[in-house]
């Protein structure tokens, strides 16, 4: 979405590219699976210098929740440089890549709220790259903790442990604050902090400090999402 020459992102770019790729292959009667679509869109993004984790692409492949683990970027780059045929690149295994649906049993409601803030993921990525070499130890600590917490969150969602889900969300938020402490990448605005404080758990969405803030609470119903596009 655009307003006053400012771009507001809602993860829509990944969804649009996934839809276009599926539509073209369907029109051409070419069979495909979700991994093929993900790889095609990712290669397009990399070719056009579109930065990011590609998590929005993975999340757009299926309805519901998705577990996504990013591929090893340097190893993928080696594959791209060593192969001329795009089919060979797509058919090659991408080290580290995992995309699979999550089937939550936990009765949790996510309250997603639009902040009205503008955030540019590319600028955050650029800022991080400028600082990463100076904080390699801290970054390794952050990534290790994040991976463990995500695995714990998936297990809690699928086992139906609502309390552990909320506790893990808060730990993920704390870990993001740790990243903020040495990366100079702002994670939350004051309005986001106040919104999160009114719920048992919460965190920013995306690269931080903009677009969407997420709050979590136990629910009497099944796992669900409530999106509020009224400006925070």
List each language-model region with its residue ranges.
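Gly/Ser/Thr-rich beta-alpha loop segments that engage phosphate groups in nucleotides
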Residues: 11, 15-16, 54, 208-212
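DPxDG-like acidic metal-binding loop motif
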Residues: 8-30
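C-terminal nucleotide
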Residues: 1-6, 27-31, 39-51, 57-207, ...
